[in-house]
Amino acid sequence: MSELKKIAIGGELRPVHFGFAALSQWCELSGLGLQDLGNIGENLSLSNAISLIYCGLKHGSRKSKIDFNHTMDDVADWIDDEGMGIFNEVMEIFTESMGKMSPAEKKKKNKGK
């Protein structure tokens, strides 16, 4: 497993990961689908932004075998403490992870548009 990207949030340096488990959970929480992932930065509600960061942190911890016993409210409080710059950091990691999709996955995703 390659080393996961980490962000400083909640008083710690925490791993972030946006694999299919994280994206599946986020789609379920947000009510959005895979076809919406390409436009995620446009008109993203505040609650969806918080849940995206939450899912990335939760699954980064899972992949790193680190306990993650935090809620979305905890993550929202951390964002309050760190500022919205943390959202930009997470979006960069998210964008990088989407760039790692295979050509077949990209083609399938583009057909859904």
Model region roles, listed by residue range:
Residues 1-13, 28-47, 63-113:
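Charged interaction scaffolds used for protein-protein
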Residues 16:
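Active-site-adjacent beta-strand anchor residues
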Residues 19:
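Residue-level signal for threonine
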Residues 51-55, 59, 96:
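Short, residue-level hotspots on alpha-helical faces of the histone-fold
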